[in-house]
Amino acid sequence: MAKKSMIERDKKRARMVAKYAAKRAALKEAFNNAADPLEKLEIHRKIQNLPRNSSPTRMRNRCQITGRPRSYYRDFGLCRNVLRDWAHQGLLPGVVKSSW
């Protein structure tokens, strides 16, 4: 189980990313369309002045149950440990144990 503070920190980052997503996308679009190097520099400064945690790169995928940050399966939103337990219990529709 991950520390509650780390889980809450990631939730805060997710809220921050959602809040600034439109502004960041507009600035990036303007940056890509700008022809003048000075204009590009000014837009780049505006992007840099956005909060650091508003960047999607700083978000970390975590297991919804345990908060574990590693071995995360996007399709399920779970870590491998919970995925294995739930699959054995039959709680994941369509997931079957492999045999060949």
Curated annotation (Swiss-Prot):
One of its GO terms (cellular component) is small ribosomal subunit. One of its GO terms (biological process) is translation. Keywords: Ribonucleoprotein, Ribosomal protein, RNA-binding, rRNA-binding. It comes from the Bacteria. GO terms for molecular function: rRNA binding; structural constituent of ribosome. HAMAP family: Ribosomal_uS14_1 (MF_00537). Belongs to the universal ribosomal protein uS14 family. Binds 16S rRNA, required for the assembly of 30S particles and may also be responsible for determining the conformation of the 16S rRNA at the A site. Part of the 30S ribosomal subunit. Contacts proteins S3 and S10. This is Small ribosomal subunit protein uS14. It comes from Picosynechococcus sp. (strain ATCC 27264 / PCC 7002 / PR-6) (Agmenellum quadruplicatum). The gene is rpsN.
